[in-house]
Amino acid sequence: MLANVPRLKALMRKDGFDAVIATCAENVTYLSGFWAMSQWVRRGPQAYVLFPGEGHEPTIIVNSSLLDLVPDQNPWISDIRRYGYFQIDTDRSVQLDAADQLQHQLFSSKAYKNSVDALVGAMKERGIERGTVGIDEMGITPQCMDQLQAALPDIKFVRCFSLFERVRAIKTPREIEILRHAARVTEGAIDAALSIAKEGVTEREMLRRFNAHLVENDAAPVVGCIGFGNRSAMINVQPSDRKLKNGDLIRFDVGGRYRHYRSDMSRGAALGDPGEKIRKYYAAVEKGVLRGYDIIKPGLRVADLFKEIVATVQREGIPHFARSHVGHGIGVDGYDPPNIAASSVDVLEEDMVICVETPYYELGFAGLQVEDMVRVTKDGAESLMSLPTGLRIL
């Protein structure tokens, strides 16, 4: 189980929810361990997890076309409700293995007409026909929400995506283990990409090597911003046929996904001497991140972390440095709470995993960025990284 269920139950009690319903891809996977593929690859497909209060088991609601993923993934929730038609046949002359037996059993179960009918059926079986139910508003379509409210008029449905965010902000030991591995694999991909760095290599060639390393290590590419020279100042640079030249800066702002969890990090390198200004400015953004390690601990106001990191970069060499944020949480989503911004009202808590970053973009010059994945410990900070933060000269 990935989810921090004790925290979920505590927040449900605090907010007065009799049940909560996960509807977006990240929350469905987080709460159940079930990866509803169609939710992740296109907009619109409906999958839900009903999580009642004490005394009732949770339920996964999923389209019949995804039932094969249940034995493949073995989610901790055993009650699976399907909806929609999908035909699959069984060769009755052979002995089915355990996975196929479970598939056959699931395809033999009742098929509801649509996702809302399946959800309503599960709720009524559990006696959830009145009271207050939290619903993650980010995945359910407006039409489905209208149908749900019409079918259960005595329930007060309250938006609760923010509740799921609060739950996900504090990671379990298993989540931290996965995030640590995701970071290691992504660092290896940066090393792999830089191993081919020489004059004439293109940004696209470097991205291909980066992505290949992720796939070879059971991860999937998600973000691959790799830019050379002045193109490194493009905020969301997409690799092109730009060739690497001596003196170029190489900026990585990259990430992948491993076992449903994200990685996000940034590093810089240069082919030969990049010049004094790049060295000076890079050292400033690096010191901003390192200053974060000095002060991160439970109870620190996130807004104060933001202010100290920005002030450090300004003091260390970029006096005009300005940012809307200098990091964010990370987990099943690339941007979990907290958002490290001046406006944040959050405080750091033990076992948050955050990305601390100090990007600087100057058109006509370069983009410089250091970003680390960091766990908040009971008395400080633990880096999930192994690569040095300094500018790497190739």
Please give the residue ranges for each predicted region.
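Active-site neighborhoods and metal-handling regions in enzymes and metal-associated proteins
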Residues: 1-394
